[in-house]
Curated annotation (Swiss-Prot):
GO CC entries: cytosol; extracellular space; nucleolus; nucleoplasm; perinuclear region of cytoplasm; plasma membrane
Major place of residence: cytoplasm
Role, per record: Plays a role in the export of proteins that lack a signal peptide and are secreted by an alternative pathway. Binds two calcium ions per subunit. Binds one copper ion. Binding of one copper ion does not interfere with calcium binding. Required for the copper-dependent stress-induced export of IL1A and FGF1. The calcium-free protein binds to lipid vesicles containing phosphatidylserine, but not to vesicles containing phosphatidylcholine.
Gene: S100A13
One Pfam family named in its UniProt record: S_100
Xref: Gene3D superfamilies: EF-hand
Segments forming domain EF-hand: 18-53
The protein's name in its UniProt record: Protein S100-A13
Length: 98
């Protein structure tokens, strides 16, 4: 029996998770992003949303709650949450202008 296709939201969530694991563990521990893996993920997958972030090293430090120089999925998820909040703000401004 074929699985039903994912909804747009389900596919988006799967993409967020898959992207993390595509980049995580290439250098350091599997299941976490090293500094270089984080930079590679951001520059390849988030170039438009994080173009004004400033130093990626500083952004990494702000997300790295346990300060182990790696991002676990929960720390990476904080970045996704921050980006979603910014997009929501932009959408709210667009709605107000209408």
């Amino acid at each position: 029996m074929a699985a039903e296709p994912l909804t747009e939201l389900e596919a988006a969530i799967e993409t967020v998770v898959t992207t993390f694991f595509t980049f995580a563990g290439r250098e350091g521990r599997k299941g976490s992003l090293s500094v270089n893996e984080f930079k590679e993920l951001v520059t390849q997958q988030l170039p438009h949303l994080l173009k004004d972030v400033g130093s990626l090293d500083e952004k990494m430090k702000s997300l790295d709650v346990n300060q182990d120089s790696e991002l676990k999925f929960s720390e990476y998820w904080r970045l996704i949450g921050e980006l979603a909040k910014e997009i929501r703000k932009e959408k709210a401004l667009e709605i107000r202008k209408k």
